[in-house]
Amino acid sequence: MFMSSIIELVTAAITPAIQTPYELVDVEYGKMGGDYVLSIFVDKEGGISLQDTADLSEKISPILDTIKPDPFPDQYMLEVTSPGLERPLKTADAVEKAVGKYIHVKLYQAIDKLKVFEGTLLSFDGTDLIMEYMDKTRKKEVTIPYQTVAKARLAVKL
């Protein structure tokens, strides 16, 4: 089974179990060293604690065992964790919550010969992102159509 199919199956199975105040941010599955790792990224307002991740792990693990047929080709380690400072912005809702924050955006197609922008998200209306970024020493604004965004995440401003 392809890794993207595993991620889709896992996401569909665990989403109903991750309820308010928690938010499912992302699911990743892949090899880390010699082991397969299923990473479930979860967050909540004010941040997630170690106890939260332990409780969610106990809730999620039995759900994964009910997926039939078993989508995992090999044994894997389950990791329930915080998305960290550079959390991915995978949905339009996540992008909307990031208005006013410093973000990193990769595009499918270039705008003004650039495919990567890093700056402050000024607004998002569901269709277009408006960002302010530094071009050498000058501040510039760019309008990015949402459908051209390949990846977006929060970024740490240095």
Curated annotation (Swiss-Prot):
- Tell me which UniProt keywords the record has, alphabetically: Cytoplasm, Ribosome biogenesis
Q: Which InterPro entries did the record assign?
A: Ribosome_maturation_RimP, RimP_C, RimP_C_sf, RimP_N, RimP_N_sf
Q: Name one Pfam family in it.
A: RimP_N
Predominant place of localization: cytoplasm
- Which compartments is it annotated to reside in? Cytoplasm
Question: What GO biological process terms are annotated to this protein in UniProt?
Answer: ribosomal small subunit assembly; translation
A cellular-component GO term for this protein: cytosol
Matching PANTHER family, A to Z?
RIBOSOME MATURATION FACTOR RIMP (PTHR33867:SF1)
The record's function comment reads: Required for maturation of 30S ribosomal subunits.
NCBIfam families of this UniProt entry? PRK00092.1-2
- According to its UniProt record, which protein family does this protein belong to? Belongs to the RimP family.
Q: What is this protein called?
A: Ribosome maturation factor RimP
Source organism (scientific name) = Streptococcus suis (strain 05ZYH33)
Gene name? rimP
